[in-house]
Amino acid sequence: MRDWNILEEVWQVIQERAEHPSAGSYVSSVLTHRKGIDKSLEKVGEEAVEFILAAKNQVPERTVSEAADLLFHLLVALQASGTDVGDVLDELAARRK
């Protein structure tokens, strides 16, 4: 099994950018976009479609890349919506019981 800590590290960076926006930060640009949460939701939709196409076309390298993009943008959208990823993890854990 791979190290899942990278998701926590990415989440921490996203939280940091939300609290302290940086001019050169992609995350900050999405979170402070004039479209508000719609920008991050657009990115989730875009990356979901790209992931679906890569998986359907059985292109492993592209599927991995698009899955990473989708996970990343999902985390950004969670932050934009004020949802803590810990609550999502708790929900997943509850479903295993």
Swiss-Prot record:
Any single GO BP term: L-histidine biosynthetic process
Main EC class the enzyme belongs to: hydrolase
EC number(s) stated in the UniProt entry for this protein: 3.6.1.31
GO cellular component terms given for this protein: cytoplasm
Key words, A-Z: Amino-acid biosynthesis, ATP-binding, Cytoplasm, Histidine biosynthesis, Hydrolase, Nucleotide-binding
Reaction catalysis annotation: 1-(5-phospho-beta-D-ribosyl)-ATP + H2O = 1-(5-phospho-beta-D-ribosyl)-5'-AMP + diphosphate + H(+)
InterPro entries for this protein: HisE, PRib-ATP_PPHydrolase-like
Molecular functions (GO terms): ATP binding; phosphoribosyl-ATP diphosphatase activity
Pathway listed: Amino-acid biosynthesis; L-histidine biosynthesis; L-histidine from 5-phospho-alpha-D-ribose 1-diphosphate: step 2/9
Subcellular localization(s) per the UniProt record: Cytoplasm
Short name of one Pfam family: PRA-PH
Family named by the database record: Belongs to the PRA-PH family.
NCBIfam families according to UniProt: histidine_hisI
Protein name: Phosphoribosyl-ATP pyrophosphatase
Species this chain originates from: Methanoculleus marisnigri (strain ATCC 35101 / DSM 1498 / JR1)
